[in-house]
């Protein structure tokens, strides 16, 4: 048998999973999910930024999550991280992160939708709040997944309710997934929030269809890209940003030549 690349070269894969919100209980859950699917030779580093919103439920929240996310990408580059997963279904800051990173970066919506299109003819996204449905549709369009996406559904469930003991969040999500299969003509479910990551196997067992969590999907995609030695292209749009002075509160984001 031929040794795996990381064994042959004495290097194990290091993947940084960035939860762009600052709720550590969710980050721990996300990290546990990634470790459960990662290869034994892969190190998972799960983090939350030092600054940002406690949850991401609007365009405003998403915009304010990006600076802390980019700080974590920059730190990962200093620490020798091989690849990154952005663990928020809005895929915030994805292209900016790719500009900073040498290795591959994927968002969980991007990863989940692409994998869903490979195992089903149509999928439904089940997310938290109705106000985020437009962003999910937008991502489906820009990723070329709109023709596979039968519907985007919301449980009207605040993100942090997923972290509350005794919450009926699980039952509400399962009910919405069941309605998606009955009403949308879909044959696969994409979970539209990183906070749902621990529900994937439970829902799949109940419904008997593929249920895709973007954290697991993103972790395995990054592992594959790193194994194939595919890095973010630095020719053209995703080249490192030009050196530029940042002012005021953004002074720490100044890039030197």
Roles of regions detected by a PLM:
Residues 17-18, 78-88, 185-194:
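Periplasmic-binding protein-like
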